[in-house]
């Protein structure tokens, strides 16, 4: 039996709070059960040097964990003088996922940076970051539209992500930490709201998984992402 008696393909309770901080053009606190991530989207009227003069924009992201986001304190990466490999991998994943649903040409020469800071971690921090960042980015773009700097929101749709895994032979969606740490296979799936794939990251930690199990994992992810996109749309409608 899963924690909180969840069904195998059921995501944790989702809460998306917009305008969470006062200064960012888009600010969202996203909660998936006990995992909580603050996603702040900042608009800059500039682009990286290699994009200047091309008339197109850019979306990037940064990711980090507060020291006591986990059960024991984790030393700040700034104190070590550099970011860890896991952090760099995750923030690149977030940025790629966001750019996949943006018409960069329609942005003009603006750049949006989404900072994803994990306040509390209970599994699925990277997938929660992507799902929350999508809403924060939508608000940042709407800020540009409302201020007359863009004619229309250049987002082509929503992007959302979820973790799925195999615990024994059972396919589970949106793994909590206790499930993730025991899973034979752990996979992160990123999709558009239409169900098109953006990224699949999957590893067999224990027994290798079959093609049939892979398809079952992806189907479970699609069910979960459909639910997440509905929560994103509901949050933006309020």
Swiss-Prot record:
It is an enzyme of class 2 (transferase). One of its GO terms (biological process) is rRNA catabolic process. It holds the Pfam family RNase_PH. The keyword Ligase does not apply. The keyword Transit peptide does not apply. Keywords: Nucleotidyltransferase, RNA-binding, rRNA processing, Transferase, tRNA processing, tRNA-binding. InterPro entries: ExoRNase_PH_dom1, ExoRNase_PH_dom2, ExoRNase_PH_dom2_sf, PNPase/RNase_PH_dom_sf, Ribosomal_Su5_D2-typ_SF, RNase_PH, RNase_PH_bac-type, RNase_PH_CS. Phosphate binds at residues 86, 124-126. It catalyses: tRNA(n+1) + phosphate = tRNA(n) + a ribonucleoside 5'-diphosphate. Its EC number is 2.7.7.56. CDD domains: RNase_PH_bact (cd11362). One of its GO terms (molecular function) is tRNA nucleotidyltransferase activity. NCBIfam families: RNasePH. Phosphorolytic 3'-5' exoribonuclease that plays an important role in tRNA 3'-end maturation. Removes nucleotide residues following the 3'-CCA terminus of tRNAs; can also add nucleotides to the ends of RNA molecules by using nucleoside diphosphates as substrates, but this may not be physiologically important. Probably plays a role in initiation of 16S rRNA degradation (leading to ribosome degradation) during starvation. Homohexameric ring arranged as a trimer of dimers. Belongs to the RNase PH family. This is Ribonuclease PH. The gene is rph.
